[in-house]
Amino acid sequence: MEEIIAPISKEILKAELSEDKRLRFTNKSHNEIYVITYQDSPNVMKEIGRLREIAFRAAGGGTGKAMDIDEYDVMENPYKQLVVWNPEAEEILGGYRYLLGDEVQFDEHGKPVLATAHMFNFSEVFLKEYLPYTVELGRSFVTLEYQSTRAGSKGLFALDNLWDGLGALTVIKPNVKYFFGKMTMYPSYHRQGRDMILYFLNKHFGDKDKLITPMKPLEIETDKKMLENLFCYDSFKEDYKILNTEVRKLGYNIPPLVNAYMSLSPTMRMFGTAINYGFGDVEETGILIAVNEILEDKRVRHIESFVKQHPEAMKITSGAHPILTK
């Protein structure tokens, strides 16, 4: 386990987070969202790598390296980094990395060069009919200090701020129809609790079309009959109440990101779970969300609020910076 690098100076970060890289202001907490790449903001990338590694290690994952930066962050056509910046404290409070499906490269075997390609198989239908209109999301994190209730409203709305950034992407890139990403659970999470969550997700969101499948699917260890009897309702809401109660009985909560994704869209697709062996053996569940099926209250908050801030984005995309509009 390597020692994590020292923080990057605030002055250096501010110099790289120039106005042309700012995507929008957040709805809550008066934070700012930027989109950068390793090539145009190498020091911000280092700070992201530092904060990611701290957050993931604390949860039981991470790379074990001095910072979490991999080949997908630094390749020729790299993943873009969406970060939330707190201008008062002059620090990053969270982020995502993403790649637009129409920019995905393919290797000599015809496999997409995606960060999830070592864990999931992609069907021809997905590659042809979905991928060109999809944004792949990954490495979602909230800085450790902002995960605490001590952070007050800044911490409370960190995840909400990240959704604001994703909402803006759907406006600036109108051909984006889907978000593909992963819900991460850690090996330290209670096994029976994990099995309940995965069974519940598969029952209510399981993909019947096999668009994407895990190469080595994670098997549920808990007795299936017991889970079947436990989650006995057709209704998502009734089964969810049971899930929440049973997980709490074990002394755990449903992970915040799992809750957040479930509350985004009733038609989310779940593709099964794979173990990410190079990243602390975390358990990654693949999901797909259709932008036009995001629930109205979320759409108004994260997407339509951006249109109000940037009406020009609906006519031409000049309101966004060059990384997004190239």
From Swiss-Prot:
Its EC number is 2.3.2.-. It catalyses: a (3R)-hydroxyacyl-[ACP] + glycine = a lyso-glycine lipid + holo-[ACP] + H(+); (3R)-hydroxyhexadecanoyl-[ACP] + glycine = N-[(3R)-3-hydroxyhexadecanoyl]-glycine + holo-[ACP] + H(+). This is Glycine N(alpha)-acyltransferase. Pfam families: Acetyltransf_5 (PF13444). The keyword Lipid biosynthesis applies. Belongs to the acetyltransferase family. Disulfide bonds: none annotated. It comes from the Bacteria. Keywords: Acyltransferase, Lipid biosynthesis, Lipid metabolism, Transferase. GO terms for biological process: lipid metabolic process. GO terms for molecular function: acyltransferase activity.
